[in-house]
A protein has these predicted regions:
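Long, hydrophobic alpha/beta structural blocks
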Residues: 81, 93-218
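Long, charge-dense
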Residues: 64-85
């Protein structure tokens, strides 16, 4: 169908068909489709959820070879130069339209504050939509995997800060200056782990997980759920 859609008029139909296929494997799934000049591309996005990332990689690694002859299946939005988004009223937003303030929170951990004058009307009327556009644009400028790996806090401002800022389009270079590797390999990201210690519960009726004294995890969100 994508090959036949030369005039790009069947986008909604294509998305619905792909969504129906993916919903056989996932309860909820966010994805994008494209064409790189040689193959069609299916980009599966975890939307910042590390638990979902494990699921998407499993799906990617088990794709039939017949499918991979015609499709590239990628996990995480890929960084693209000169990328931009368009609002429903036809307003184009690029990385050059967004001011960024970057604050170091810890080792390889940063907070972002973003200000975009073009999106102020949307921010006031459709705050969630404005947040989605700015976080998605950051994914596309930086790459979704580096975004998940290094940006632990994201704030959208209604007015700029007094401190000096830089453009969102410069964010990859700013992070490289910090010595960070901006790999888009999701498996490499999942190989990183966190060690922890805790006081074990002595109550014999406590949940099993609560008698652990020390451990490590590659998926902090899932580990937190197990101790709640």
């Amino acid at each position: 169908m994508m090959d036949e859609d030369k005039d790009h008029t069947r986008g909604a139909e294509l998305v619905a068909q792909m969504e129906g296929a993916l919903n056989q494997a996932f309860d909820e799934i966010s994805f994008e489709m494209g064409f790189n000049g040689e193959k069609h591309e299916l980009i599966l996005t975890p939307e910042g959820d590390k638990v979902k990332l494990f699921e998407l990689i499993y799906f990617q690694k088990h794709a039939p070879k017949e499918v991979l002859e015609h499709w590239n299946i990628l996990v995480g939005r890929q960084p693209l130069q000169n990328i931009g988004l368009r609002t429903e009223n036809g307003l184009d937003i690029s990385g050059d339209d967004v001011q960024i303030w970057l604050e170091e929170q810890g080792e390889n951990s940063f907070a972002i504050s973003a200000y975009c004058e073009k999106l102020l009307p949307m921010l006031r009327e459709e705050e969630g939509r404005a947040w989605w556009m700015l976080t998605t644009l950051t994914d596309q400028v930086l790459g979704e995997i580096p975004h998940m790996r290094y940006i632990d806090s994201f704030d959208v401002l209604e007015e700029p800060k007094a401190e000096p800022s830089f453009l969102l389009s410069q964010l990859p270079d700013k992070l490289r200056e910090q010595g960070l590797e901006l790999s888009t390999d999701p498996e490499a990201y999942l190989e990183s782990y966190l060690g922890y210690k805790m006081e074990p519960k002595q109550d014999p009726d406590a949940d099993w997980r609560l008698d652990v004294m020390a451990g490590s995890t590659c998926c902090v969100p899932l580990d937190r759920k197990s101790v709640v």
